[in-house]
């Protein structure tokens, strides 16, 4: 979410003047051309109260066209700042912004979400959730997050980078499946290792699973799956020797890992109160010519073009998931349509859609992180 809000501010700043009100330390990560006001340190309530105060001051001074909350958490502050300055109030919502079950959040935050002049959501699934809490459909616009498109490379360079990455991580020449993301129950990696990977290994004995990511330090409604738990599940399933945990890696190495892999697996689980809002990692994979096999859960259906950038499987169908992986290993999808699909999610395209949704041509926009 932090990275998304940075790109959000950057895209709006390319179209007008932007002031960001955010937590302490945000100035060090703000894009060029953005005015930054830091609000509150330590406890969440300090940030929220500071964001409200600084947002009101900034909005009254600068008379913005729009005050935009970068998530549901800051929606009340954005709405109040907008009303104090005569601006339009808007919010960018993720699935968890709507489904958080805390009674206070539902009592106080949901009414502010319903009052917003514009509600931008990250997927059709989040749109349904937003309508479910009473947000008027005519106020909602669906704009998935963007992705940084890599520089084009030819097949010779692709094969070279693939070979070098495998050597760095000690991975042989068999098929490589890739999982990228935080290790939470929603991501379903333990279930994949337990129920799906053995079926694939029966057909492809040398298949390997590369895992990028760690359990979350702290996330709303997230329940962690630890590497130890995943290894234990793999041991019981007889596939422990197929696993390679890389932990957190930088963006440059992640690009190489995408090129190294044959298929990105995204076995997202349907967990009440913990939806997968979109699935940007599937777009990132497609941008590198890597197809995704995923369960058709939540916003993932917007992130994977079935038959173009990967395959979608009914949630919970372990055998079907394995079959789709095996099918793509035997008959890979062409890369060019995959790259074209991902190109539609570039950050400039995201910025154009967002500006249109907010009714902005020339503007000054306040953003609450």
Residue ranges and their predicted role:
Residues 3-49, 125-126:
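N-terminal strand-loop element at the rim of the active site
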Residues 69-75:
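Short His-centered aromatic/hydrophobic patch
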Residues 282-287, 291-294, 304:
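Short hydrophobic beta-strand element within catalytic cores of glycosyltransferases
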Residues 213, 222-252:
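Nucleotide-activated donor-binding/catalytic signature segment of Leloir-type glycosyltransferases, i.e.
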Residues 306-307, 311-318, 326-332:
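Conserved acidic donor-binding segment of nucleotide-sugar-dependent glycosyltransferases
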Residues 242, 248, 259-274, 290:
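Acidic donor-binding loop of glycosyltransferase active sites
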Residues 19, 114-163, 171-172:
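Donor nucleotide-sugar binding/catalytic pocket of nucleotide-sugar-dependent glycosyltransferases
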Residues 160, 171-187, 193, 197-198, ...:
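Conserved donor-binding/catalytic core segment of Leloir-type glycosyltransferases
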């Amino acid at each position: 979410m932090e990275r998304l809000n940075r790109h959000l501010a950057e895209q709006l700043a390319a179209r007008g003047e932007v002031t960001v009100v955010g937590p302490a330390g945000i100035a060090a990560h703000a894009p060029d051309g953005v005015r930054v006001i830091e609000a509150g340190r330590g406890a969440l309530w300090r940030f929220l109260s500071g964001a409200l105060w600084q947002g009101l001051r900034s909005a009254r001074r600068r008379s913005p066209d729009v005050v935009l909350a970068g998530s549901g958490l800051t929606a009340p502050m954005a709405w109040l700042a907008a009303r104090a300055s005569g601006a339009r109030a808007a919010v960018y919502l993720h699935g968890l912004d709507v489904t958080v079950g805390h009674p206070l959040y539902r009592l106080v935050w949901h009414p502010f979400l319903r009052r917003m002049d514009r509600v931008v959501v990250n997927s059709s699934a989040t749109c349904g959730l937003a309508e479910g809490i009473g947000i008027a459909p005519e106020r909602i616009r669906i704009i998935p997050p963007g992705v940084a498109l890599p520089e084009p490379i030819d097949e010779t360079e692709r094969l070279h980078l693939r070979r070098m990455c495998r050597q760095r991580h000690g991975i042989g020449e068999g098929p490589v499946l890739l999982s990228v993301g935080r290790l939470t129950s929603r991501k379903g990696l333990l279930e994949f290792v337990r129920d799906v990977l053995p079926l694939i290994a029966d057909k492809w004995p040398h298949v390997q699973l590369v895992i990028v990511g760690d359990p979350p330090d702290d996330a709303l409604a997230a329940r962690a799956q630890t590497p130890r738990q995943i290894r234990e599940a793999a041991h019981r399933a007889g596939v422990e020797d197929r696993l390679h945990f890389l932990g957190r890696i930088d963006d440059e190495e992640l690009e190489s890992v995408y090129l190294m892999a044959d298929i990105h697996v995204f076995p997202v689980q349907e967990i009440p109160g913990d939806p997968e809002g979109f699935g940007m990692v599937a777009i990132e994979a497609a941008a590198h010519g890597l197809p995704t096999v995923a369960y058709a859960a939540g916003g993932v259906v917007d992130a994977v073009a079935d038959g173009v950038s990967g395959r979608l499987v009914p949630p919970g169908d372990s055998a079907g998931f394995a079959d789709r992986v095996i099918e793509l290993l035997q008959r890979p999808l062409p890369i060019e349509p995959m790259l074209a699909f991902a190109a539609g999610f570039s950050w400039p395209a995201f910025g154009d859609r967002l500006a249109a949704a907010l009714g902005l041509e020339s503007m000054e926009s306040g953003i609450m992180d």
